[in-house]
Amino acid sequence: MRIWSLTRILTFIVIFNFAEAGGECMKKCDSPDMIREIFTRCTMVKRDTQFSENSGHLIPKRSVVADNKCENSLRREIACGQCRDKVKTDGYFYECCTSDSTFKKCQDLLHK
């Protein structure tokens, strides 16, 4: 009986610590700083970019990669599981990778 109680307590501690770590990560990803980092490091949309309308949102047809830090920022977002479909910054909408399956498609879009 004692071993059973000890096992339950240890399991609770492990799960609780994991949940706490995940919560911190999500908070970090959801922060304006993280969104700003994705905006500045990942995509820079030229002022003369042509926009297409999709479900009432304006989306840049072509994006320019600032540097290879883009990949790391997007991977962090995926790891945190807290990525928006569209991130609005300075009046522009940016497509965001929401899972590993869309990551390749997103990278292809960014590298065009």
From Swiss-Prot:
Propeptide: 22-65
S-S bonds: 70-97, 80-96, 83-106
Signal peptide extent: 1-21
GO cellular component: extracellular region
Cell location: Secreted
GO molecular function: sodium channel regulator activity; toxin activity
Tissue: Expressed by the venom gland.
Keywords: Disulfide bond, Ion channel impairing toxin, Neurotoxin, Secreted, Signal, Toxin, Voltage-gated sodium channel impairing toxin
Keyword Signal: yes
Function: Gating-modifier toxin that inhibits voltage-gated sodium channel with a preference for hNav1.7/SCN9A (IC(50)=25.4 nM) over hNav1.1/SCN1A (IC(50)=4.1 uM), hNav1.2/SCN2A (IC(50)=813 nM), and hNav1.6/SCN8A (IC(50)=15.2 uM). Is an effective analgesic in rodent pain models, since it is several-fold more effective than morphine in a rodent model of formalin-induced pain and is equipotent with morphine in its ability to reduce thermal and acid-induced pain.
Further comment: Negative results: does not show effects on sodium channels hNav1.3/SCN3A, hNav1.4/SCN4A, hNav1.5/SCN5A, hNav1.8/SCN10A and potassium channel hKv11.1/KCNH2. The synthetic peptide has been found to be inactive against Nav1.7/SCN9A at concentrations up to 1 uM, in contrast to the isolated natural peptide described in PubMed:24082113. Intraperitoneal injection of this toxin has no effect on blood pressure, heart rate, or motor function (as judged by a swim test) at doses up to 1-10 umol/kg. Arose via modification of ancestral neuropeptide hormones (ion transport peptide/crustacean hyperglycemic hormones (ITP/CHH)).
Protein family (similarity comment): Belongs to the scoloptoxin-03 family.
Record remark: domains: Is exclusively composed of 4 tightly packed alpha helices (no beta strand is present).
Name of the molecule in the record: Mu-scoloptoxin(03)-Ssm2a
